[in-house]
Regions:
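A phosphate-binding catalytic loop at a beta-strand-loop-alpha-helix junction
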Residues: 92-103
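Cys-dependent protein tyrosine phosphatase-like superfamily
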Residues: 1-92, 107-163
Length: 163
């Protein structure tokens, strides 16, 4: 059973899910899974294609937003995360190797619509000490003012469950 860390009432993070975890988190009430692991990052991880199939089987929506460990603040990752968070049903469980990257990407996405102090306070309440990313979050908060209209969104990673 995965160790789930709630960030908000509608969003939680976890370490990489195993095959047997998908049914468990669906039974816990999660409606969407966001996978921030690039395929092949860890030796025994569930592939993105298998994770999608497991989500479909469990009746959950799925988004794969591969975020390299040192690439969490890239336009494509942040925009895809924002899109997934805005359009998919909650509650959402996001995962990566440890859960920290998922929390950081959430913070980057939320900092464009929520004060950075509030984002960091929310993370602190959940047990994460991410004060060291304040400058990165401040840059994300300023993006809407200087990013070109339409941004640089990559192709949508969002996959809905099969009907």
């Amino acid at each position: 059973m995965p160790h789930v860390v709630p960030i908000t009432a509608d969003f939680a993070v976890a370490r990489a899910l195993r095959t047997e975890d998908f049914e468990v988190v669906a039974a816990q009430g999660f409606r969407t899974i966001i996978n921030f692991l690039p395929d092949g990052e860890t030796q025994f991880q569930v592939s993105a294609a298998d994770a999608r199939r497991l989500c479909e089987k469990a009746g959950m929506a799925y988004a794969h937003v591969p975020a390299q460990k040192y690439g969490v603040f890239t336009d494509g990752v942040v925009m895809a995360a924002r899109q997934a968070l805005a359009s998919l049903q909650s509650p959402v469980l996001a995962y990566c190797a440890s859960g920290q990257r998922a929390a950081i990407v959430w913070a980057a996405a939320k900092s464009q619509s929520m004060p950075v102090d509030a984002v960091l306070a929310t993370l602190t309440s959940a047990g994460f000490d991410f004060g060291y990313i304040r400058d990165d979050l401040e840059q994300q908060a300023d993006r809407p003012r200087w990013q070109p209209a339409g941004g640089s969104a990559d192709q949508s990673p969002i996959e809905q469950p099969a009907a």
